[in-house]
Amino acid sequence: VFFALRGENFDGNNFALKALEQGAAAVVSDSVQVFEQYMETERRSVETKRRGIFFFCRDSLQMLQELAKYHRNRLKTTIIGISGTNGKTTTKELIYSVLSSAFKTRATAGNLNNHIGVPLTLLSITADTEVAIVEMGANHPGEIAFLCSIARPDMGILTNIGTAHIEGFKSRENIITTKKALFESVKNSHSSKAHLFVN
């Protein structure tokens, strides 16, 4: 599935129709113009073979996040959330190295730990995955709480709290409040697996 996401320097909608041509099973787009181009192409097409499905929505990013949340809610996988100012990726890799020797384990690829990376990580989890390690980063207040609302971690690990990205947070207190949201999420999950770890 190709999600046509927008960024500061790109617009995935520009590649949506190309993705279908190259075999994508589906495209999710929030561009009226691209949807109209798709419909026009479908009308003109004389091929009997159908291409992938085009989903037109109000916001492609929100659709990605909602789909990830839906997928997470269907999983029985134990989700371990990791946050902190530094050391998230190293901690994730160390934990993955240990757990994957005994369990079918999935982990965030690289440091894809934001509002796009966390949903992509969740969507990569298969039904037979026993443990998933989800890295969660933040550069502004409220971001960890939002990521937790999607990932619903059973366990939380906080590596440390420093002053990196303080320009987005404005104060150390805001950083602490934001990072603490991981623990609040785990505590409020009422999961029988709930555990919290602080470095």
Give the residues covered by each predicted segment:
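Phosphate-binding loop of NTP-binding sites
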Residues: 56, 62-198
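Short, basic phosphate-binding NTP loop
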Residues: 1-81, 90-101, 123
